From Swiss-Prot:
One of its GO terms (biological process) is L-histidine biosynthetic process. It is found in: Cytoplasm. The keyword Magnesium applies. The gene is hisG. It comes from Escherichia coli O81 (strain ED1a). This is ATP phosphoribosyltransferase. The keyword Amino-acid biosynthesis applies.
Length: 299
């Protein structure tokens, strides 16, 4: 029997988002063994169950109220939303927040030896894709007629196999396209992972747990995007040093023993510190510059 007091979260069992989702939950302090083949895993320290399923099943599980939360790519979520609307349904859910992983783009690609004069080049062509609804929406907005060839995998081989004239598929680096004699010609949708919640009334204990989880996720993402910086800086150049390091708050300034001309400065910077920035700091007279990763952060 299902325990309705436990928060149920759906995540991808294996694939592009699985490892990042697992790491996110671990850094949020959820102790759970996700290295087995079990489809349902129970957290040891929180009333949370993790359902490990195919990524294209996750939006439906959330929209149908089977699970409370889902970690899913926006491309898969939007495709399912358009699919259900096309069938006359009114799917409901909440996007709690965008996450900082799973970035990709859904793009049109054509054979490298074919001319490209914009989307109109696809008028009357056959296009292979795993995302027919996203493709249709985009080309309908352009007023382009086309034929869709639905494939659930190996979309990039369709032109070479004579199944289609072009493709619409996810692209990360473009290496797979190049290996199959294709080139990316148009981005139609940009996606990242997101956390979604089912519609409807939520038990107070579950909502409190969701709020706690969101706070921790925010802290994890902020920590990833921030660095803890320590240095010695000349007192007369402090304003210039601080201007180079956008931070969440003002830095902590500490006196240096036996040195009236310099201070120790500690701060959290919200911007990645590149070598060029460190060289500029050194040129301003800063020394002993340390840049450290942050494991957890809460403002």
């Amino acid at each position: 029997m299902t325990d309705n007091t436990r928060l149920r979260i759906a995540m991808q069992k294996s694939g592009r988002l699985s490892d990042d989702s697992r790491e996110l939950l671990a850094r949020c302090g959820i102790k759970i063994n996700l290295h087995t083949q079990r489809l349902i895993a129970m957290a040891e320290n929180m009333p949370i169950d993790i359902l490990r399923v195919r990524d294209d099943d996750i939006p439906g599980l959330v929209m149908d109220g089977v699970v409370d939360l889902g970690i899913i790519g926006e491309n898969v979520l939007e495709e399912e939303l358009l699919n259900r609307r096309a069938q006359g349904e009114d799917p409901r859910y909440f996007t709690l927040r965008r996450l900082d992983f799973g970035g990709c783009r859904l793009s049109l690609a054509t054979p490298v030896d074919e001319a490209w004069d914009g989307p109109l080049s696809l008028n009357g062509k056959r296009i292979a894709t795993s995302y027919p609804h996203l493709l249709k929406r985009y080309l309908d907005q352009k007023g382009i007629c086309f034929k869709s060839c639905l494939l659930n995998g190996s979309v990039e081989v369709a032109p070479r196999a004579g199944l289609a004239d072009a493709i619409c598929d996810l692209v990360s680096t473009g290496a797979t396209l190049e290996a199959n004699g294709l080139r990316e010609v148009e981005v139609i949708y940009r996606s990242k992972a997101c956390l979604i919640q089912r519609d409807g009334e939520m038990e107070e204990s579950k909502q409190q747990l969701i709020d706690k989880l969101l706070t921790r996720i925010q802290g994890v993402i902020q920590a990833r995007e921030s660095k803890y910086i320590m240095m010695h800086a000349p007192t007369e150049r402090l304003d210039e040093v601080i201007a180079l390091l956008p931070g969440a708050e003002r830095p902590t300034i500490l006196p240096l023993a036996g040195d009236q001309q310099r201070v120790a400065m500690h701060m959290v910077s919200s911007e990645t510190l590149f070598w060029e920035t460190m060289e500029k700091l050194k040129a301003l007279g800063a020394s002993s510059i340390l840049v450290l990763p942050i494991e957890k952060m809460m403002e």
